[in-house]
């Protein structure tokens, strides 16, 4: 079993021995047990409140192995708008509902939700159901490690 306890400063020269694909929700868990594809058990034991991001590198406490976190493709809704103002309005309404949202200049991405999908469609956005990596904003207080 690998026990990951330390976040390592990203460095392209590091020799990563394993990748750990996690959904957005799983990347918010600071203490959790995962079983990866080959049956190996990985245990996260990070400081409470740690939110992992795609590309983060963690170190195993026993042998020092380095594991890269990868944003795992998952079901999402992608919303696009005819104007940036409409996209900003949609982001505002989703924020009022405290919904995790990935925000870019050209689209918003959120977890599937029929009520929110209907709301966004009524606002005039085009919604596409996809399976992609989901990287929502951390919020004003969510970023607690250096990048």
Curated annotation (Swiss-Prot):
Intracellular or extracellular location(s): Cytoplasm
Gene3D superfamilies per UniProt: Urease metallochaperone UreE, N-terminal domain, UreE, C-terminal domain
Example of a GO cellular component annotation carried by this entry: cytoplasm
Organism of origin: Trichormus variabilis (strain ATCC 29413 / PCC 7937)
Assigned protein family: Belongs to the UreE family.
Superkingdom per UniProt: Bacteria
Lineage: Bacteria, Bacillati, Cyanobacteriota, Cyanophyceae, Nostocales
Function: Involved in urease metallocenter assembly. Binds nickel. Probably functions as a nickel donor during metallocenter assembly.
Name of the molecule in the record: Urease accessory protein UreE
Keyword annotations of the record: Chaperone, Cytoplasm, Nickel, Nickel insertion
SUPFAM superfamilies assigned to the protein according to its UniProt record, in alphabetical order: Urease metallochaperone UreE, C-terminal domain, Urease metallochaperone UreE, N-terminal domain
Gene that specifies this protein: ureE
InterPro entries, per the entry: UreE, UreE_C_dom, UreE_N, UreE_N_sf
Sample GO molecular function, one term: nickel cation binding
CDD domains per record: UreE
Annotated SMART domains: UreE_N
Pfam name, any one: UreE_N
GO biological process, one term: protein-containing complex assembly
HAMAP family: UreE
């Amino acid at each position: 079993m690998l026990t990951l306890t330390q976040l390592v400063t990203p460095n392209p020269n590091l020799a990563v021995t394993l990748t750990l694909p996690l959904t957005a929700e799983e990347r918010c868990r600071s203490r959790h047990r995962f079983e990866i594809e080959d049956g190996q058990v990985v245990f996260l034991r990070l400081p409470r409140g740690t939110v992992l991001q795609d590309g983060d590198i963690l170190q195993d406490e026993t042998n020092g192995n380095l594991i890269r976190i990868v944003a795992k493709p998952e079901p999402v809704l992608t919303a696009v708008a005819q104007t940036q103002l409409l996209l900003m309005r949609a982001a505002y309404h989703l924020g009022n509902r405290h919904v995790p949202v990935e925000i870019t200049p050209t689209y918003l991405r959120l977890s599937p939700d029929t009520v929110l999908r209907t709301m966004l469609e009524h606002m005039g956005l085009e919604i596409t159901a996809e399976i992609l990596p989901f990287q929502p904003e951390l919020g004003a207080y969510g970023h607690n490690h250096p990048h």
